[in-house]
Regions:
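Short, conserved catalytic-motif segment at the N-terminal edge
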Residues: 22-76, 99-101, 151, 234, ...
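Structured C-terminal helix/loop/strand segments within mature extracytoplasmic catalytic/sensor domains
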Residues: 327-384
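Hydrophobic h-region of N-terminal signal peptides that target proteins for export
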Residues: 10-19
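Short, surface-exposed loop or secondary-structure junction motifs
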Residues: 57-59, 116-326
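Short, P/G- and charge-enriched loop/turn segments at secondary-structure junctions
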Residues: 30-32, 75, 162, 322-328, ...
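Bacterial N-terminal signal peptides that target proteins for export
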Residues: 1-8
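Structural recognition of the beta-strand scaffold that forms the well-ordered cores
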Residues: 42-44, 54, 125-127, 206, ...
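Short active-site loop at a secondary-structure junction
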Residues: 34-42, 64-125, 160-172, 244-247
Length: 384
């Protein structure tokens, strides 16, 4: 049945994308399995109107007896995709409702976030990673429980002046998760499903994994030779209770496809509006021409619009070298990726469990090469 659906989808593609281009995509994804970067993957491609192609590759583990990943039912630990799939849209809805102001100081909503120059850190700075906070802190080693982790987060000093430079930081989104809880009055694990995932029709995405879905969930590591799955891989997220602003969501390829279609539709999908076109455009607008970050989203830095350094070929970027100025996306440490290019009406969801016992050294860099090659192949085939 899956093969029939895939073939039908390919037959319905616009002329700019055809079966040959999807065979190239298959070959690129399968090369990552052959090289030992990941045991399996799912790929979902499409545009505003819907999914055009979807497929699962390899297996959930290196054993051929383990299930083949399925775009509809295999749940992946989304890692940092949680930032843009859960936390950021929750903030966007609160902004639209007038409950949060992007340029208000964070301390207005989180009064314990004080000290030094923290009074100048705004909500916007958390979203675009210009707060001045350090990139990372081992809360799981330095604290004993969620309360002590939150206390450490609040007292962590800034490393740079607020607004001065971009430094991608999990701490920014840990704070945003706490902000969503403070303003909404609900735990993140309740608010995000109610305010974001449910309205978006993402029925197979959430914090943690239901018992009925465990056998079809991709493991993200090993312990004493056995697969480890179904609880968040990120140890800081675990310290924060499993549902944190920077990590914690599990989801499927087709659910994430719905989410990207919603953004291509400027906040609307299947007659349901999550937020207004103005809010969608606000969160997808760069602060300046050379910006590499949007509000939550990453802005691929290699494009001819001057954002970042020129990309060397082969391009050492998860997004390749061909995306337009309008493109946006994000990656996750476990091996997850999504991006969309509104100028080409194209989205890509590419989920792997790279973190599960990779057979290749420096699998993060190797996966980046696969992602970049895939992006370039798809964009070139979609360009008249």
């Amino acid at each position: 049945m899956r093969r029939w659906v895939t073939t039908l989808a390919a037959a319905l593609l616009p002329a700019a994308l055809g079966a040959q281009q999807y065979r190239v995509a298959d070959s690129i994804v399968e090369s990552g399995i052959r090289r030992g970067i990941y045991p399996g993957a799912v790929l979902v491609l499409g545009g505003r109107a819907g999914i055009r192609y979807q497929k699962g590759y390899g297996h959930l583990t290196w054993s051929a007896a383990s299930p083949v990943p399925d775009p509809d039912s295999t749940r992946y630990d989304l890692a940092s995709l949680t930032k843009v799939v859960g936390t950021m849209p929750a903030v966007a809805r609160l902004v639209e409702e007038g409950k949060v102001a992007l340029d208000a100081p964070v301390e207005r909503y989180l009064p314990r976030f004080v000290g030094g120059a923290k009074g100048r850190v705004t909500v916007r700075m958390l979203l675009d990673h210009t707060s001045g906070l350090p990139a990372y802190l081992e809360f799981f080693r330095l604290t004993q429980d969620r309360d002590s982790a939150i206390a450490l987060l609040y007292r962590t000093p800034l490393r740079r002046a607020p607004g001065a430079t971009v430094e991608y930081s999990d701490l920014n989104f840990l704070l945003l998760g706490l902000l969503v809880e403070a303003v909404s009055g609900e735990p993140l694990a309740r608010h995000v499903p109610r305010a974001v995932l449910g309205p978006a029709g993402m029925t197979h995405t959430g914090y943690g994994v239901p018992a009925a879905a465990r056998e079809r969930t991709a493991p993200t590591g090993q312990y004493r030779g056995r697969p480890v799955c179904c609880s968040v891989n990120d140890q800081n997220a675990a310290r924060f209770g499993g549902a944190a602003g920077h990590a914690g969501l599990f989801g499927t390829g087709t659910d994430l496809a719905r989410y990207l279609r919603l953004w291509l539709g400027e906040g609307e999908l299947d007659g349901v509006r999550l937020f207004s076109p103005a809010t969608a455009r606000l969160f997808l607008s760069p602060a300046e021409a050379g910006a590499t970050r949007l509000l939550g989203w990453e802005r691929p830095p290699h494009r001819a619009n001057g954002a970042g350094e020129p990309c060397r070929r082969p391009c050492d970027s998860a997004y390749g070298s061909e995306l337009s100025d309008a493109a946006f996306g994000h990656t996750g440490w476990t091996g997850t990726l999504l991006w969309a290019d509104p100028a080409r009406d194209l989205f890509v969801v590419f989920l792997t469990n790279r973190s599960y016992a990779p057979r290749l050294g420096n699998s993060i860099r190797a996966l980046r090469g696969v992602r970049g090659a895939l992006a370039d192949a798809l964009v070139r085939s979609a360009t008249p």
